[in-house]
A protein has these predicted regions:
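Generic detector of multi-pass transmembrane helix bundles and their immediately adjacent loops
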Residues: 38, 43, 55-169
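Long, repeat-rich segments with strong aromatic
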Residues: 24, 51-58
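Soluble extramembrane regions of membrane proteins in the secretory/endomembrane system
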Residues: 1-11
């Protein structure tokens, strides 16, 4: 056995960093959502954005609901003041309901989908800004790397699927 062999990358004593994978998956999800939202007027593109956007909203909103539950109804140490609530927002469940209503109704995406997706992305970006402040020291790099690009991609896709209308005055 060589001295220091246990400290080599990949050994059982040194866990491999998964941060790159979280970032890659977040960028992939966000990129696909942004792309699919732009194709929402093109037949299958609408269905792709509805399915993928609804799935992302359900997953992120479900994670947010779980964190709110843990924060409100348990004494779990790590659930209290969990900044990841800005990343996995319970508002995702509301967005899921709006997406389901859009799927049933058909037609162009409602403005409420765009507005709520952008709101969720702004909260997510606010979580990044909070990390720069000395009062917030939670180690949540993995959550930031996954949720921020995915939430921004969802907002971009929703904005492309439901563009703001400019009415003449």
């Amino acid at each position: 056995v060589r001295p220091g062999a246990d400290d080599a990358p990949g050994s059982s004593r040194t866990p491999a960093s998964l941060l790159g994978w979280f970032l890659a998956f977040g960028v992939l999800v966000g990129g696909v959502l942004g792309w699919a939202g732009g194709r929402s007027g093109a037949g299958r593109g609408r269905g792709a954005f509805l399915v993928l956007g609804s799935l992302w909203s359900l997953v992120s909103g479900g994670a947010g609901f779980l964190m709110v539950y843990l924060w409100a109804f348990t004494d779990h140490t790590y659930a209290w003041r969990n900044e990841n609530l800005l990343q996995a927002s319970v508002l995702g469940l509301v967005l899921f309901a709006l997406m389901a209503g859009w799927a049933r109704r058909g037609g162009p995406a409602p403005a409420s989908v765009r507005a709520l997706a952008i709101t969720i992305a702004v909260f997510s970006a606010a979580g990044v800004v909070m990390q720069l402040l000395p009062w917030f020291s939670q180690v949540n790099g993995a959550a930031l790397l996954l949720f921020v690009p995915a939430n921004i991609g969802m907002a971009l896709g929703a904005a492309r699927a439901a563009p703001a209308t400019t009415e003449p005055t």
